[in-house]
C-alpha cells in the first residue's frame, strides 16, 4: 500500500477519499479548445519540431473547425470512430482535436502495429475513417492497408467498400502524393464551405461532456487488447488535475511519450490544452538526441518520459553536453525511478524537480501523483497522493477492505473511471463493480 503513504497510520481501513479544492468541470474537448483559444490566442499550442510545424491556439481552433466540418461532410456522424494510425506528429494532434469538435470518437492505434493487429483494432471498434501517415521507420502504411483492404486501390476516395472492413468508409493519409482510394490529409485542413464550418460551431452545445471522446486500447498482456471508452468528462478533468499538480500552466512541454497512449493524451496533450501550455513533439518516435535538441532550441521547461527514456536521454546528454538551461521539471511514469536515476536526472539534465505519476488506461491516465514539494523518499518509494475527487481502497480476495498497510487489490472510484470496454460486456463486468469501483487487478 505504498501509494497510501501520506495517510495517517491511525486510519484503520485502507479507504481514502481525496476531497480536493477545485471543482470538477463539465466541458467537452471542443469547448475547452474554444476557451483556451479565446484566453491565449497567440500562445503556441503545439510545435512539431521534427516537421518544422507550429500552431498557436487560435490557429489550432481555426484549422480544427475546418477539419471537423470536413469530417462531417464525409458522412461521419456523432459517435462514429476515427482511427489514428500514426506516430507523433501534427496531424495526430489535429485529428484528435477535430474528431472531438465534430462529436466523433478518436481511436489511438499503435503505429508499430502490423496488418493483423491493425485489422483487429479497426474491427473491434468499427472505425469509419482512418487517418494515417505515409510511413514510420520501416512501416509503409498504405501497403499495410492493402493487405487488409485490397479494395482501396479501386475505390473512390471517401467511399470505400471493403468486404473485410465493412465499417471503414474513408482513409485519409498525410502524404504529398495522391494515393489511390485515399484522401490527402492536408486537403481536409481547409474548408471554403462557411455553412459547414458554422454547423460545427453551432453543434458544440449539442455534444455532452458525458459522451465518448476517445478510445484507448489496453496493452493486451492477458489476451487481445480491450477498447477502453473515455468520455470528454474523463479526459478534461483528468488532464486538468494532473496538469495542475505538474504546474503545467505556461510551461513548454517536451513530449517524448507516444500520443496513442493514455499518458501522451491526458498527461500531455489535453493537460497542455487545459492549462494553456505549449506542447513540443521532438520526433515521430523516441529519439534522445532529437529530444535534447528540441529542449534546447524550443526552451522546454518540463520533460515528460518513462524511466527508460530518461536513461537514454542522460546517456546522450553526457555525450553531447548540450546547454540545457530552461528545463526545470521532469515527469515520469510507468515504473519507479531508482535513486541513481533520480540523481542523474537532476544532475545531468539540470532539472530541479522530478515527479512520479501512476495510473492506468481504464482510469483515463493518472490517479496518483507526487507533489512538487515531496522529498526524495516519497518520489522514490511512493506514487504520491490520490487525485482530487477520487476514492481509493484496497480489498482482499473476498472483496473486504483490508486494514491500512496490508496488501491487496487496489480499487478506484470517481470521475476518471472509464465508461466501459466497447463491445465487451463480460470484461466490463469483471473490471467494474455495480457500484462503479474499478478493479486494477
What are these regions (language model features)?
Residues 1-2, 104-190:
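Structural core segment of the AMP-binding/adenylate-forming
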Residues 1-74, 78, 123, 147, ...:
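N-lobe entry segment of adenylate-forming
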Residues 74-76, 192, 196-211, 215-256, ...:
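Conserved adenylate-forming
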Residues 235-252, 260-302, 312, 316:
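Conserved AMP-binding/adenylation subdomain of ANL enzymes
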Residues 18-27, 179-212:
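Flexible, low-complexity linker/hinge segments
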Residues 25, 45-97, 114-119, 186-193, ...:
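Conserved AMP-binding/adenylate-forming core of the ANL superfamily
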Amino acid at each position: 500500500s505504498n501509494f497510501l503513504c501520506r495517510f495517517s497510520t491511525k486510519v484503520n481501513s485502507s479507504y481514502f477519499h481525496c476531497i480536493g479544492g477545485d471543482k470538477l468541470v463539465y466541458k467537452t474537448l471542443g469547448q475547452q479548445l474554444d476557451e483556451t483559444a479565446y484566453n491565449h490566442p497567440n500562445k503556441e499550442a503545439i510545435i512539431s519540431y521534427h516537421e518544422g510545424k507550429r500552431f498557436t491556439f487560435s490557429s489550432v481552433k481555426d484549422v480544427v473547425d475546418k477539419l471537423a466540418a470536413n469530417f462531417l461532410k464525409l458522412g461521419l456522424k456523432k459517435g462514429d470512430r476515427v482511427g489514428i494510425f500514426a506516430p507523433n506528429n501534427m496531424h495526430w494532434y489535429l485529428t484528435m482535436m477535430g474528431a472531438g469538435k465534430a462529436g466523433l470518437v478518436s481511436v489511438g492505434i499503435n503505429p508499430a502495429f502490423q496488418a493483423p493487429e491493425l485489422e483487429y483494432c479497426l474491427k473491434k471498434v468499427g472505425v469509419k475513417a482512418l487517418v494515417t501517415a505515409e510511413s514510420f521507420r520501416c512501416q509503409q502504411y498504405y501497403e499495410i492497408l492493402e493487405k487488409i483492404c485490397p479494395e482501396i486501390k479501386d475505390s473512390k476516395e471517401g467511399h470505400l467498400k471493403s468486404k473485410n472492413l465493412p465499417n471503414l468508409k474513408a482513409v485519409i493519409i498525410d502524404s504529398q502524393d495522391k494515393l489511390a482510394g485515399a484522401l490527402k490529409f492536408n486537403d481536409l485542413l481547409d474548408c471554403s464551405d462557411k455553412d459547414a464550418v458554422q454547423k460545427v460551431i453551432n453543434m458544440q452545445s449539442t455534444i455532452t461532456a458525458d459522451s465518448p471522446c476517445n478510445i484507448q486500447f489496453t496493452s493486451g498482456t492477458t489476451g487481445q487488447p480491450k477498447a477502453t471508452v473515455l468520455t470528454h468528462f474523463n479526459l478534461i478533468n483528468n488532464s486538468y488535475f494532473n496538469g495542475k499538480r505538474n504546474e503545467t500552466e505556461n510551461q513548454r512541454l517536451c513530449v517524448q511519450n507516444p500520443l496513442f497512449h493514455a499518458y501522451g493524451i491526458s498527461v500531455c496533450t489535453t493537460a497542455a490544452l487545459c492549462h494553456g501550455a505549449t506542447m513540443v513533439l521532438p520526433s515521430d518516435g523516441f529519439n534522445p538526441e532529437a529530444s535534447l535538441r528540441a529542449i534546447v532550441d524550443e526552451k522546454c521547461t518540463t520533460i515528460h518520459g518513462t524511466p527508460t527514456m530518461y536513461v537514454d536521454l542522460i546517456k546522450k546528454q553526457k555525450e553531447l553536453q548540450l546547454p540545457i538551461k530552461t528545463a526545470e521539471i521532469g515527469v515520469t511514469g510507468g515504473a519507479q525511478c531508482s535513486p541513481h536515476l533520480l540523481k542523474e536526472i537532476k544532475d545531468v539534465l539540470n532539472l530541479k524537480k522530478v515527479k512520479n505519476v501512476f495510473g492506468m488506461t481504464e482510469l483515463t491516465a493518472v490517479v496518483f501523483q507526487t507533489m512538487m514539494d515531496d522529498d526524495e523518499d516519497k518520489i522514490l518509494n511512493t506514487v504520491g497522493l490520490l487525485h482530487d475527487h477520487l476514492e481509493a481502497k484496497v480489498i482482499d480476495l473476498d472483496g473486504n477492505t483490508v486494514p491500512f498497510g496490508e496488501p491487496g487489490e487496489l480499487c478506484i472510484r470517481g470521475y476518471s473511471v472509464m465508461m466501459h470496454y466497447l463491445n465487451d460486456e463480460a470484461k466490463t463486468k469483471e473490471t467494474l463493480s455495480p457500484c462503479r469501483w474499478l478493479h486494477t487487478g
